[in-house]
């Protein structure tokens, strides 16, 4: 059995270099919600040094709220914004001798694409038009996954060890009770359920399907690096191979 571990990096928080030693995929901020040309290049170089798969982590143009505020962009603007961010990171990756492997939207863009079919379709089409070989990463069971499949893209469904789930498979919004798991044992158990049993317990107690290919390790929490080590050790002890292939 194998699974990918991914982390959102180049966002100016957390120890990116240390996390890159624990994950198999890196989602690099493309300058809109966080990051700039310098942080993109530095993170790309670190990822190449560690042999970690490089992906784009595009978001809304919302630095003030770290890309976590919902926005209602015209669909053409959403397409143009995604292409702009993909192009910026791709240019740096290629210039440094690497290859862009995947795309994972950030924050509100991620969540809206998971539940809004029109936005999901626009993003999926833009990714296909930019590079049909790119893998799309999104919330397991969400609209974005369906839209990317419809465009012929390879998809990876993502799960979260540190986020609460609603019974419909969506994430509990940040700021609401149950949105964030804090206890190491609870987070490890949730990750193990998703990786080995393809299920997750929703906040109402209902066990729901969670067919995931990759688990996200958030790098901005107080104990993020320590938990990342714990999770990797637990999965490897259970015989799970950590890889991006």
Swiss-Prot record:
GO BP annotation list: carbohydrate metabolic process
EC number of this enzyme: 3.5.2.9
GO molecular function term, any single one: ATP binding
Catalysed transformations (reactions): 5-oxo-L-proline + ATP + 2 H2O = L-glutamate + ADP + phosphate + H(+)
Keywords: ATP-binding, Hydrolase, Nucleotide-binding
Pfam families documented for this protein: LamB_YcsF (PF03746)
Family label: Belongs to the LamB/PxpA family.
Functional note: Catalyzes the cleavage of 5-oxoproline to form L-glutamate coupled to the hydrolysis of ATP to ADP and inorganic phosphate.
Name of the protein described by the UniProt record: 5-oxoprolinase subunit A
Organism, as annotated: Chromobacterium violaceum (strain ATCC 12472 / DSM 30191 / JCM 1249 / CCUG 213 / NBRC 12614 / NCIMB 9131 / NCTC 9757 / MK)
Gene that encodes the chain: pxpA
